[in-house]
């Protein structure tokens, strides 16, 4: 590092070395005292890059000299500091100096006496004497031995083998006084602080001892100060130091050997990679792909909705979109990556990979995470019973008897048109009953009733027996895997035949217990109150066998039975709670709608704060109108409810958009034919969502090849001005079921000539619409034979045409009649009579056995002997058939 050592000398008990480091000069002062503090304030930067380094080591933008001037003070040989008058005595701290370097009010001398100690040339400190600079009760000598160790010229320290190199801390030494694995210099750094000249010198620091007011310069290789504590007492032997040196050399050799091996391995792999053939690279890529496939296998089954894009299907199957597109091309289907394929195509495609497809609904795609349930909190719950059966078989009358009220008084036409929920108490136990409509239009209502119930009570008339809606109710119950109790009603009538009913039901798998089956049959008469108690006992017995339980402490889960708009209260939904407890203030999701419970109204019209499992309740607080049958579930927060609702609405829009047909060459003819259909456009309004759904489905079934019903809009609530405006724009009629128009809507309807039809009974609405459709049908055209005439003469009149002189041999001939010209028993022409005359007079008809002149429109090739048959066209009104 250093070019040469310019000077080595002693100045006042300290060794001074001047070393040239390339273009810089460093003055190194070594003290015998090791009490320099190990803090950053003990070091002063002697080098400043902004100033040129001179022999004077000037710093801090000050003019330098040999005096090592600092802090913008005038320098001199006296090393003046801190605004004090200097001299050779190195005066400090406002004290009068002399050659003796007197400090701290102590009598000085050449001996540099400090701390009230008697001095001498030997620089004796801490009651220790001798030229050897002895310290800490240690025997001194020229070797400057320390820490009870035998000294020598090598200045051995801390269990280290000495030599001229002044080796320390088990490190191989040299003239540089190496310490702490750092490259040293001649500076003899002590006081538990290690400095070195390693690399280029960045800064030079001066160690400042506050107790002696002396300085020493040293150099650092880094911009931060590195402090290393040296153990105070460490035993050392030359043999141990030698072993440590060998161990260090061995480790360095091993490390170098490892580096060489690593370089050789890298070069070898690089050479192997460059020498690989194309076949080897392809093989490795295939192996890599195989490993990736093993890491991401194709699932055994995937869930999709009605349709899915190729990219989404590829993601679900852990495949590349290009692979699926290629497979579809092989199957004869041309698609792009973002094109949708239907569930059938997706099923065929997925089966090619040995997997299967499950078609799910939007609710399966947006499952709300349920809370962890404590099974110990599940308790017995009341049974939910759905009463089902054919219309007029006595379902509602039975429920009236159970509640001791006449429910049919509140239903138009004496039939149930809404799904009702009621709770009764029998033998101190609660039972919840659901009454479903029996009319064929309310199929979906009956289906929902079967899905939310625990037991189905099938009411069958002992007179009528099994009817279409009876069979439908059986199928709904079996599909929902719900047990059935058969109640044979009207046994009080003389024509009742229960055995016939048992035989009919056995054909559908319902075999009575007394016939060896497992279905409970109860004979009742709702009108005479016969067998009601026995029926209730059987219901409770069946529920006990089923071990019905629920957890009232969890968040509520249920189903929307029906929904309506109530003036003054907004949207009111009838909800059956299947599990958990619903409280006022709960946030929830109902289908694609969200909300927060504002109020809970029981079936008796009483406001309650909460409702438990197996109870029906009216809920206020929906943000929009849900669909009947939608799932109902309470969420943790309102934010979660809004998020799920938004996602479900997007999925519903997506499902609706996929139903839009694309016009292709394959379905173009069907589209043209469909455009020729006559449509009856209807805007449908009803009191509850369930009635809207039932009536809409019934009306849309009224379709044939010529006419059809198109419900352009349907919703629950009163008829508003918006409905009238929509009807006027779309040329539709408005049907209100159990609702009336507002006053303003009625005025607007009169102005716009919009027809409003109001109904209270569902089959009245259906029959009226059927009659309207019949009036829209084109009548059938029938040709009725009225007579024929023989051509006896042919008269050609210029500018008029050919006139056939005829004799009416049978029936009569009428003007404008349709004729068939027959010659030799073959029809040669069919046309209309344009002129009929008797002599010169135009007549409307000519009777039998009279002569007349007949001119046929646009026909002149008539000959004598031809027979003219006359037909009258009649239009016959068609009857509507679906």
From Swiss-Prot:
Sequence segments annotated as region (G2): 414-418
PROSITE patterns the UniProt entry points to: G_TR_2
MF GO annotations: GTP binding; GTPase activity; translation initiation factor activity
UniProt family annotation: Belongs to the TRAFAC class translation factor GTPase superfamily. Classic translation factor GTPase family. IF-2 subfamily.
Residue ranges of the region described as G4: 489-492
Biased composition (Polar residues): 38-56, 97-124, 140-192
Main location: cytoplasm
Segments for region (G5): 525-527
Basic and acidic residues bias spans: 243-259
Annotated segments matching region G1: 389-396
Protein name: Translation initiation factor IF-2
Top-level taxon: Bacteria
Region described as G3: 435-438
Ranges where the record places region Disordered: 38-192, 236-274
Pfam families: EF-G_D2 (PF22042), GTP_EFTU (PF00009), IF-2 (PF11987), IF2_N (PF04760)
GO cellular component: cytosol
Record-linked CDD domains: IF2_eIF5B, IF2_mtIF2_II, mtIF2_IVc
Source organism of this protein record: Borreliella burgdorferi (strain ATCC 35210 / DSM 4680 / CIP 102532 / B31)
Gene3D superfamilies found in the cross-reference section: P-loop containing nucleotide triphosphate hydrolases, Translation factors, Translation initiation factor IF- 2, domain 3
Keyword annotations of the record: Cytoplasm, GTP-binding, Initiation factor, Nucleotide-binding, Protein biosynthesis
Location in the cell: Cytoplasm
Domain tr-type G: 380-553
Positions of GTP binding: 389-396, 435-439, 489-492
